Design a protein with these regions (language model features):
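Catalytic metal-binding acidic patch
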Residues: 52, 59-80
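Gly/Ser/Thr-rich helix-start
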Residues: 52-53, 186
Length: 270
């Protein structure tokens, strides 16, 4: 059984004392448990840690993330099924009631597992309803792009591990490609975070979006922004932010892209 008080103590007061953050604190701890288990499994040679939870646990972005996403190579449905069962068994042996409720869709191009934790929030005193849903999704998909993974150190909540991750420029390009494809509010926020640190990999963007250089990237981003309501988008991820006021950063995304330039590939103010 998880010890909520012990888990909360790993987080600074401004995070742990906010009632809205408590279930995300628990989720992050379980994500770390799963990553720690996978880091010592045979599957770690076939998967690379990507997505928003990478930004949170590896890069230190100031928001929670809900899913565990992996790029995978030489990894088939049987591998994912075995990995999924091993993760479930690990959680159950750790004293956590965990159940898989997933039917793979023929239309889905990724391997996906939804792990439900029945009554966990109720047992931890975080919900008055036994039936309140609490889940973590694990998704693995071959991104179809070759790169050499790097080993990143993840140190959080008493866990310490090394895990394969993409180079920063590839991770940035993955996020920009996601933004251009689905335009979620968190994608704009994450893109600002990554572009302040690194340039994107244009080979990836060429393959996925037909973007070859900075000029084309800025044009495509501005075109995308003009089709969405950023005020509305800012509300779809505010619950994940440590400070909800930071959601307003994406409202100036268009001006930021138009008025700033990339020096050495990174976005900097002119």
């Amino acid at each position: 059984m998880l010890n909520l008080e012990q888990i909360q103590n790993y987080f600074p007061p401004q995070i742990r004392e906010n009632p809205a953050h408590k279930k995300y604190i628990v989720k992050e701890y379980i994500q770390l448990m799963i990553l720690s288990f996978l880091a010592t499994s045979k599957f770690v040679k076939k998967i690379t840690f990507i997505g928003g939870t990478n930004l949170r646990l590896v890069k230190g972005i100031d928001r929670f993330s809900e899913d565990l996403d992996f790029d995978c190579k030489n990894f088939n449905a049987e591998d994912f099924a075995e990995m999924s069962q091993m993760v479930l068994t690990f959680l159950q042996r750790s004293g956590i009631r965990a159940e898989a409720r997933e039917k793979q869709s023929e239309k889905l191009t990724a391997f996906r597992l939804r792990i439900y934790f029945p009554e966990l929030l109720f047992d931890l005193g975080l919900s008055a309803y036994k039936e309140e849903r609490f889940l973590i999704k694990i998704e693995s998909q071959n991104q179809g792009f070759k790169y050499t993974p790097q080993m990143a150190t993840i140190s959080s909540c008493g866990f310490f591990m090394s895990f394969p991750v993409p180079p920063d420029d590839v991770l940035c390009a993955m996020k920009l490609s996601a933004l251009l494809s689905r335009a979620k509010g968190r994608d704009f926020y994450d893109a600002l975070f990554l572009l302040s640190q690194t340039k994107p990999n244009y080979d990836f963007l060429t393959q996925k979006q037909g973007i070859h250089n900075l000029t084309e990237l800025k044009a495509k981003l501005i075109e995308t922004i003009e089709k969405v309501d950023l005020l509305h988008k800012s509300k779809d991820f505010e619950h994940l932010l440590f400070n909800r006021e930071n959601k307003d950063k994406i409202l100036n995304f268009s001006e930021f892209i138009k008025k700033n330039e990339l020096r050495n590939g990174k976005i900097t103010c002119t």
